[in-house]
Amino acid sequence: MYLTLQEWNARQRRPRSLETVRRWVRECRIFPPPVKDGREYLFHESAVKVDLNRPVTGGLLKRIRNGKKAKS
């Protein structure tokens, strides 16, 4: 099921201004990304904001960076 930008924002724990949410969409901070339908964005009901400032520290990424010594 898809929600409009206003409906998706209203369901968030801390709703933000519509312009802020539109900026997040342009900066690809929403996953899965919303679909633009005419003049409005449609969000999947399970879409979430992704924090791009948080470093990605997965096990595979550590092994790629450090080689076999990081595998545990």
Swiss-Prot record:
Entry keyword Magnesium: no
One of the record's GO molecular function terms: DNA binding
Listed Pfam families: Exc
Keyword DNA-binding set for record: yes
InterPro entries: DNA-bd_dom_put_sf, Excisionase-like, Excisionase-like_sf
GO terms, biological process: DNA recombination; provirus excision
Signal sequence range: none
Keywords annotated in UniProt: DNA recombination, DNA-binding, Viral genome excision
Function text: Part of the excision complex necessary for the excision of prophage from the host genome by site-specific recombination at the att site.
Subunit structure comment from the entry: Interacts (via C-terminus) with the integrase (via N-terminus). Part of the excision complex made of the integrase tetramer, IHF, Fis and Xis.
Protein name: Excisionase
Source organism (scientific name): Escherichia phage lambda (Bacteriophage lambda)
